[in-house]
Amino acid sequence: MTTRTGPQYYPGADHVSYWYEDDFDATAMEVNVACLHTTEGRTVPNYVDSQGRKGASAPNLTAIPDFASRRLRWYQHFRIDSSARALANRYGGVETNTLNVVQAELVGTCDPATHAKWVKAGYQHIYWPEAPDWAKRDLADFLAWLHEEHGVPLSGPSRWPAYPSSYANGAGQRMSATTWPAFKGVCGHMHVPENDHGDPGAIDFPELLALARAALNLPKPTNPPAAAIPAFPGRKHFALGQSNNYVTQLGKQLVKRGYGKYYSVGPGPRWTESDRRAVAAFQRAQTWTGAGADGYPGPETWRRLFS
């Protein structure tokens, strides 16, 4: 297979100060996926592992905000078509870092708790779900360049849940071991199998794609209308002893969203403790607690589950 056919250095990026490809083996690829991370810090990390090796968990590039200039400054660690090291890759599982993916870490946070702490401390930073326009513009320019020079599609997952519900597969957003190898486009760390991290959180992905397409003067894509959310049938259908099609419908959607582990068999029409536990897990993933996570679906649980 032909590899490394496009330009290997992002224009304007510093590929000297934090260059790690000379220190680690890297697989030659032909990228068709871009994966976005957040560093959860305010400086460029050294990406040190437990053995003290700098760059051992580095992506291909890191973007740090320059608040004075209102721009992102880019540091490159590996060539574009070289495998980086920022994704977990379990023994015997699917390929992650080496599966034609270029990775970019965005300095800042996607965690609302960290954001609140830094605001209180007066630390200048980017909370990526609410990134300033200039940061979104520069990130979109990077995606546009990847599309134009490497053919990375300007498309990706529809679900970018907020952290911490995005951690592990709390919001059912993570790709499976079978869907990931076929994926092409832009995704987040939260979407890659064998990984637990929930970054980059609820970034405005549609806006990023729109900005990238505008930078290339591409027409707006025509999207099929979203499927209508089925009407909530009422709480009475989800109680001990109830048996109806709505319970089956609920259970199938829970499995689709990643909560199948709560079912030893099924799901089926009879309301069981398995259904309640699966619903409760989904509710907790919305950061609800107490009565809001009791395992019995109400209108808002239903709406979010089927969104």
Which stretches of residues belong to each language-model region?
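Active-site-adjacent loop/helix surface patches within enzyme catalytic domains
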Residues: 2-154, 176
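Basic/polar, cationic surfaces and motifs that engage anionic cell-wall
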Residues: 2-11, 109-228, 281-284, 297-307
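Second-shell loop/turn segments in exported
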Residues: 90-91, 121-134, 234-242, 264-269, ...
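Glycine-rich, acidic and aromatic/proline-enriched surface loops and short helix-turn segments
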Residues: 100, 105-110, 188, 192, ...
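Charged catalytic carboxylate motif
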Residues: 138, 246, 278
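Acidic, Ser/Thr/Pro/Gly-enriched interdomain connector segments
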Residues: 217-269, 273-274
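SH3/SH3-like beta-barrel superfamily modules
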Residues: 273-288
